[in-house]
Amino acid sequence: MGEDSTGAGANGVDDGSRDAVRVRIAVRADVPAMVRLLADDALGAAREQLDGAIVAEYRDAFDAVDRQPGNELLVAELGGVVVGCLQLTVIAGLSRRGVTRALVEGVRVAAQLRGRGIGATMMRVAMERARAHGATVMQLTSDASRIDARRFYERL
């Protein structure tokens, strides 16, 4: 925990305040911001909730992910504010002579900040972390109805 990567220079993000996006391992205190990001479109709003007792369910889920080896929740910060998140899971496999895979899901960037390189920086960091864990294949899940997200992934 506590490791981070900064996307500066060509891969960084300039929001006018000279703050670069910083990608780091999520902590429990990030859960409300992450859920808000997950609910930041019509599909997510139908799936996610952030009120009262439900927050405890998300914190329990965070704890379960955090305890499971090979699972990482990453957040992107800009100016100290969480503006993106994703989940990276490293999976041992039998196929391809036992190749280790990485699965990326739950990728979100705040709607008002899309198109500024934050998602690309998050994916670059996820790929670096996956390689560091021995993964040689990376898979990504995305809902077919998220057309803009699919276009983004196709450009990577």
Model-derived segments and spans:
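Short glycine/proline-centered loop/turn elements that form peptide/ligand docking sites
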Residues: 123, 146-149
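Active-site acidic-Proline motif in GNAT/NAT acetyltransferases
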Residues: 110-112, 116
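Acetyl-CoA-dependent GNAT
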Residues: 3, 11, 16, 25-99, ...
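Residues forming the Rossmann-fold NAD(P)(H) cofactor-binding site
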Residues: 116, 120, 124
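Conserved GNAT acetyl-CoA-binding A-motif
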Residues: 123, 130-142
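Conserved active-site tyrosine of GNAT-family acetyltransferases
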Residues: 153
